[in-house]
From Swiss-Prot:
Membrane topology: Single-pass membrane protein
Name of the protein described by the UniProt record: LETM1 domain-containing protein mdm28, mitochondrial
Main location: mitochondrion
Region (Disordered): 430-473
Targeting presequence: 1-73
GO biological process: mitochondrial translation
Topological domain spans for side Mitochondrial intermembrane: 74-161
Pfam families: LETM1_RBD
GO cellular component: matrix side of mitochondrial inner membrane; mitochondrial inner membrane; mitochondrion
Lineage: superkingdom: Eukaryota
Organism the protein comes from: Schizosaccharomyces pombe (strain 972 / ATCC 24843) (Fission yeast)
Length: 473
């Protein structure tokens, strides 16, 4: 109990606690105690001024703290002899005036903001200078490495963001509205003007969004049983797999899982996801979730193409060539959980992703759905990414399953099955048409973006003999 660690002074005025260093405050169960004084490395709590009954508290209830320091103080039981023999250094330290951290004034904050924007401007100028050399390197016929390609892409995006930012510079007194505009549109400024606090806030918001999306996907993906038919034997392997995972609950082999995953191509998967699931995927991938269903599918396909090119570049150069920030960004862009994981664990997760994508040829949309499906679970729920992938396939919508069966090259589908599948597709088309009619502006924007051609990113200048042929296109 606390009374075993505290002792009364000769004048019976209070209690003392031996400290490892001078403290500037005391709290008991998060309640500050204002009546205390320092005495040769000890604290004297005057119970005449602060009516606190110590007998009902445990030692963990009392916290001594020091403003500006996170040092933990010792709670050894003092004796009167130790108090008398206290070192002179401790007494000298206690006589020093305590420094109180003051909040910066308005002028200091304005000055700090101006310096931050000035440093960001100089940093942007250096990036433009570096990127101009990379453009010249491309013009003479050399290929860029992954790091150089990402540097050039980031600089081009920052230059594009300067167009709306220049309005606040040209229009008189428009800079007064800049903080409000940045608050409403966080991506308005180039990346060089973003401070560490804003980056951490965005990461925390993305983690929160991904947890919500993961829970929503698990609740919306249907878990009902498929209707299996034994009329043909060409797709027996495909049907046996889903009978195992959804009817009998058996675990298929990894070879069966790989073969079945290859049937779920990216276009088929995206075309048979509902709007709620498409919006959830866009939010999970940190994309714009506004627009028609075709626009959402286009955004997801475009991001997946970028990830596939990046996969090939990392596979050629090796995971060990990535720095720690690049490793975190690579895992984060693929929907892999990064919070609380060591760099060694992240390298393992990224290596599994590359093996699934490059070596085994599993479609990227199914892998992203698998990451989103398992993101909300605690670490250790799945033994491996393969188990999460199996659960994802066991929860796919019925429309996606039926469309995949029809799309199989060796599958002979009866007219009755074709009629049912066509009705399902007709319902999806009608829902999309209704949404386009309600939002004509979004449909026009989607048409314009489809006409725009995306620039192919450059990969490293290395032999691609280790990449399968289906991944070189």
């Amino acid at each position: 109990m606390l009374r075993n660690r505290l002792f009364k002074t000769p004048h019976q005025t209070g209690f003392q606690w031996r400290l490892g260093a001078p403290a500037t405050g005391i709290t008991i169960r998060n309640q500050p105690i204002r009546s205390y004084s320092g005495l040769r490395g000890n604290f004297l709590i005057d119970k005449r001024l602060s009516p606190v009954k110590f007998n009902k508290y445990s030692p963990s209830d009392i916290v001594f703290y020091n403003i500006g320091s996170s040092r933990l103080y010792s709670t050894e039981t003092p004796t009167p002899s130790k108090v008398k023999e206290a070192p002179k250094q401790v007494a000298a330290e206690e006589t020093k005036p305590t420094t109180v951290v003051k909040k910066p004034s308005i002028w200091q904050r304005v000055k700090g903001g101006v310096l931050h924007f000035w440093d960001g401007t100089k940093l942007l100028g250096v990036e433009i200078k570096i990127s101009s050399k990379l453009v010249y390197k491309m013009a003479v016929g050399y290929e860029l490495t992954r790091r150089e390609s990402r540097q050039l892409t980031r600089t081009l995006k920052d230059i594009g963001r300067l167009v709306p930012f220049s309005v606040f510079v040209v229009v008189p007194f428009a800079e007064l509205l800049l903080p409000i505009a940045v608050k409403l549109f966080p991506n308005l400024l180039p990346s060089t003007f973003e401070d560490a606090k804003d980056k951490e806030a965005k990461k925390a918001q993305l983690r929160k969004t991904r947890n919500e999306v993961s829970n929503m996907l698990r609740s919306t993906l249907k878990s009902g049983k498929f209707t299996f038919s034994n009329e043909t034997r060409e797709s027996k392997e495909f049907r046996d797999f889903f009978q195992k995972v959804r009817t009998s609950g058996q675990s298929p082999s990894r070879e069966e899982l790989i073969e079945v995953c290859k049937y779920f191509k990216d276009d088929i998967t995206l075309d048979n996801l509902s709007r709620a699931q498409l919006v959830a995927m866009c939010r999970y991938m940190n994309l714009n979730a506004f627009g028609t269903d075709p626009l959402l599918r286009y955004n997801i396909r475009h991001r997946m193409r970028q990830i596939r090119r990046d996969d090939r570049a990392i596979y050629i150069e090796g995971i060990n060539s990535l720095s720690i920030p690049e490793l975190f960004n690579a895992c984060n862009s693929r929907g892999i959980r990064t919070q609380g994981l060591s760099p060694a664990k992240l390298k393992e997760e990224l290596s599994v992703w590359l093996d699934m994508r490059i070596k085994h040829g599993i479609p990227s949309v199914i892998l992203m759905l698998s990451n989103a499906f398992s993101y909300g679970y605690n670490e250790g729920t799945y033994d491996s990414r393969w188990d999460a992938l199996q659960d994802t396939l066991a929860s796919i919508p019925d429309e996606l399953y039926h469309e995949t069966v029809v799309d199989m090259p060796t599958k002979q589908v009866s007219n009755k099955e074709r009629l049912e599948i066509l009705r399902e597709q007709e319902e999806l088309i009608e829902e999309e048409a209704e949404h386009v009619a309600e939002h004509p502006d979004l449909a026009k924007k989607q048409t314009e973006e489809n006409k725009a051609t995306s620039k192919p990113a450059v990969s490293a200048k290395s032999p691609e003999s280790n990449i399968p042929k289906n991944e070189r296109k």
